[in-house]
Amino acid sequence: MNSILKNSVMAFALMFTSLGAFAGVQVGVSSDNYFRGHNISDGVGYHVFASHNLDNGLWGGVKLMSMDGDADHFMASMIGYDYNLSDKIEIGVGYADYSFQGGDGDGWNEMMMSVSYDGLGSLRYRKGLDDAGDMWSFSTGLLKYVDLSYGDWDDGGSYFQISKSWDMMGGSVKVGYIDHEDNDDDFADKLTDFDNFFVGYSYNF
């Protein structure tokens, strides 16, 4: 079953690549690359993200992030389907394949489910396949001036992030603070530790 889903993801990505149908390509650089609360670049990192949304609700995308450690890059390939229940409510399902490029790390696969309410936020649940852990997360811009997100991953612990984005030079600048449960520093030390803060710039083509 997993091999069928993997092949579907790759076929979807190859189809769009061959047709030149990617509607959006984003490139970015950040003081640190974070994935689910974990700093995977241990310093300046970059990412490339290509995606496409079809008119019938189907979508697909591939994201590549630089990393430091046992691999050169971390890649996420995803396909999914979104459906609007109303003007405010959207539900979605999808499949994701995560892999490590240039190293020996083992990847994993997930089924994804989400519900979003316009003006309130999004709740996402990811079911790990085989022996992979599950994850749920919530994100919201309800605080008006900043975005807030929280996630809890069986294989990686819990984290929260607060961030703010601005349009600049044709792209977007994002600054934020992220804290993971593995960080044992007291609150005062966390606020003075620059490792907990990040700044990045991304540009969409």
Tell where the protein language model's regions lie, with residue ranges.
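Outer-membrane beta-barrel proteins
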Residues: 2-12, 18-205
